[in-house]
Amino acid sequence: MIIADLRTIAVRTFPARRWTRGMVGQAGQPIPAKGFAMGVVVLEPNGGQVPWHNQEQEEVYMILQGEGEICVGSEKQTIKEGQAVFLPPTVFHQLTNTGTEPLHMMYIYCPGGDVAHWRQELDGTLPVAGVSPTPHLPAGAQPQCTKKPSI
């Protein structure tokens, strides 16, 4: 039997002001499922973000605490604690914390494995919204964070 304890899983810190703990289905994670991946993310207040990106896997974000702005394709909405959003494969999406408290979120995607946008963000090579072939963000959306802001 494998039991994963979130408190003991290493944190990945990303430039867009968030940290992630993968639990299932990713390289080096305690539960080696292949069919799906799952983990938790905390977005810092006032703009912490999972920046505009797409991926081959279908995915769900479940908001556990806080409130933010979710963009999926050409749509933009507020999302809050207790709500989940489906992210279809290859569709660009972005989640931004618009609140003054941390936003806690669980992600689940299938199949499992690491996704390219993590490495792109860490390497500073994440495609920029609106620069071909990457589509523009929906009108009025929070700007995409492609590097850690200087505060």
Residue ranges and their predicted role:
Residues 1-35, 51, 117-151:
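A short, N-terminal "cap"/entry segment at the start of jelly-roll beta-barrel domains
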Residues 19, 56-57, 75, 91-92, ...:
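A generic "binding-loop/recognition-motif" signal
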Residues 35, 40-45, 54-70, 108-110:
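Short, conserved beta-strand element in jelly-roll/cupin
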Residues 47, 60, 67-69, 76, ...:
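Structural motif
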Residues 50-52, 70-71, 87, 93-100:
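Short beta-strand His + acidic residue motifs that chelate non-heme Fe in jelly-roll/DSBH
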Residues 74-89:
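Short acidic-glycine-tyrosine-enriched beta hairpin
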Residues 98, 108-115:
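C-terminal structural segments of small proteins and small subunits
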